[in-house]
Amino acid sequence: MPSSHDWINKPLGVVEAMFAQNNSNPEWEEKVLEYFRGQLKEKESLSWVPSLNDVPLHYLKPNSLVKFRCLVQDMFDPEFYMGVYETVDPSTKTNVLRCGKYKDVTECGVDLNSRNTVTAERQTFYCVPIPGESPWAKESYGCSSQARVVPSTSYVPSRQKRSYEEDDDDMDTQPQKQREPHTEPHGNGDSKRQETEAPSSQTTAPSDCSSHLDLNFPLPGERGPACLVKVYEGLDSFKLNDTLEIYGILSVNPVLTVLGEEKDPSSLLLNPSESMESPEEQRAHDPPASLVPRLHMLYARPLQHNNPLLPSAPTEDHSAFVSSFLVEMASVRAELLAYLTHVLLGDGLAAEYLLLHLISNVYTRRDVLPLGKFTLNLSGCPLNSYTERLYQIIQQLVPCSYRLSMSLHTMNSMRLVPKKDYVANRLVSGALQLARNTSLFLDETQLEQGQLDSSGVRNITALGNLISWQKVDYDFSYHQMEFPCNINVLVTSEGRSLLPSDCQVPLQPQVTPPNMEEYLTTIHMAQFTSQMNKFRVYLSLARTLDYSISDEVTKAVEDDFVDMRKDDPQSVTAEDLHRMLVVARLLSLSMGQTTLSRDGWMRAKHIDMLRRSRTEQQKSLNSNEP
């Protein structure tokens, strides 16, 4: 069997050895997968594998095992490759069967006339780092790694080091030549530059033109590698926008970037479909390997959450962790509520609703109705820099977030909805292509007077659909395709938001700091890292807890609602009942309670009454203004 390090440093050697021993047995491929899955189940073995998210590409050894924490941004058409091919040994002149799985190119000449060639099928996913991942989460993932890497010296680059922008410019200025930008070989050894940085201009440009190479990140200014992931098994188990931690064999062979007439026919046969692609498709589907490395998947772990402070679920470690943390849920909740109250200028009611919003989660769907969503509109927010600082504080609490400044220019120019580019045969990303449980902060205080153009109207409509139905309708030109999502949306506004929401809470500051920036900075700096980590664990854990309502409490709630309707038939509606049930659920989970009690229901009614009273009071004040 392979040594303890071979499966990480030389996984292809493991694969080829198993192929040589068992190629007559059709189950050899399953044995390979079982071997690697078995290795990755060993305690702490996941942390031994270097991560593309943390380690610059030039530090990683080609053909080694790496992992990549990512979102599936696009899924390309299936492709054919040479699963088994025959080569002629140049020294002995004997024919040798080779395995083509988990490879992009052949090592030596292929016998093109061999009857032993086996053509197989695989699919390519275009994967990007999880959009909006918070700096604290990235840092925590990096610190937990036990992988030891040194700069790779496997091969020397055959060109001068160049930036992403230069590669991008080359592709812009030579759009007519088939794969012309790739004629200079790229090696991972040329990456003395920062391999993991992409220019924000690639994502902020509102133009639909995709003739230039970009990394197609959903959010502007994002950094990190993009990968072409080759998938061999379990294709039906993956969906667009899945968040995964992929373990696979890294391929950055310079031959991948030698295109057009210079490409070796034998390597082309590893993917014969390439010869049928248009130049635009080739540019999108076969970017330089030094910019977009290939990753041949051996194992993929779905990420139920993206919080590095929590153990992976479901495991024994996770169950034990949850049990121990539940004991202190109530005390951590009290500390977090006090912190948020200070952040919201002394408004305890708004702080409680913000806490409930942060743990909300779409736990199921009934027909088209997403259950569990809790979009909060925090109105009456101070202008200037308050909302920006509020977002920065929320960003420190959640693993993934994004602030959309709803200025007129942004709404008219930014692409929120992903769109299919039929020329390049790829999905052009949009800012609403986000991972599940991302906190989306919509800053409506930035909206000024002016005219929304057709693009702006479409963007506002897309935001409304996201809030109301937790779905985004992707633009496929001839039709729209609906993609469900699970995004926590917080809207900050001066008055009532122009967007729908599940709950509006007018902010009532109890303090008026002379220097808002200094006030909020002082509050944040007063929190120790250990305390912030408790808050982060609390928010992620609360949304994963199971929840139920007993028949007894259900009957009590129904009777109570009937009495409320009798007392005030005009004001109390079925919508109010639904909102109070959502609030009651979130209140229970925020306490670490997985069932609704009578006290929990009464508490939900009480804070909803306070909120409605405040909202009515605010309406009266606004109507009396000249």
Swiss-Prot record:
Keywords: Cell cycle, Cell division, DNA replication, Mitosis, Nucleus. The lineage of its organism: Eukaryota, Metazoa, Chordata, Craniata, Vertebrata. Associated component of the mcm complex that acts as a regulator of DNA replication. Binds to the MCM complex during late S phase and promotes the disassembly of the mcm complex from chromatin, thereby acting as a key regulator of pre-replication complex (pre-RC) unloading from replicated DNA. Can dissociate the mcm complex without addition of ATP; probably acts by destabilizing interactions of each individual subunits of the mcm complex. Required for sister chromatid cohesion. Belongs to the MCMBP family. It is found in: Nucleus. Interacts with the mcm complex: associates with the mcm3-7 complex which lacks mcm2, while it does not interact with the mcm complex when mcm2 is present (mcm2-7 complex). Its main location: nucleus. This is Mini-chromosome maintenance complex-binding protein. Residues 177-196 have a biased composition (Basic and acidic residues). GO terms for biological process: cell division; DNA-templated DNA replication; sister chromatid cohesion. GO terms for molecular function: chromatin binding. GO terms for cellular component: nucleus. Pfam families: MCM_bind (PF09739). Residues 152-216, 265-287 are annotated as: Disordered. Residues 197-210 have a biased composition (Polar residues). Coiled coil: none annotated. Disulfide bonds: none annotated.
